[in-house]
């Protein structure tokens, strides 16, 4: 914030009520305001009162009926990400944003007896920017059992002898 007036000026960046994104029904048990969170984050970025935002969505803890639940959840997520980048471009912010997408845990590689997937310590993060020079790249790998291989933190290549596993804390520290 440049001054106290920056906060009062923020109201100029908040969308009109009729333009605020509504809640969306994603599954029988999940209503999402993710697009509204994105919209308000972009308003805060535009208003100069915010440089980072931590957004969330729910419903991914699928201990039963995993595939059918994840299909609608991921469809909503990708639609929301597209909404975010389109809105960021319109606001003139896209070239200054780095988006991290991740979870606090992954899902087991195999189904349980309820066709769900339980908690698993191996997951993934997605790092996105508008036009990165480093895009279309995967860092890290797992074996057929979905166990992480160690990587060299300098080269980002697999290194079984002296590498390390990548943890969410590595992403948070880097950004």
Language-model regions: role of each:
Residues 1-175:
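Ligand-binding pockets and gating/stacking loops
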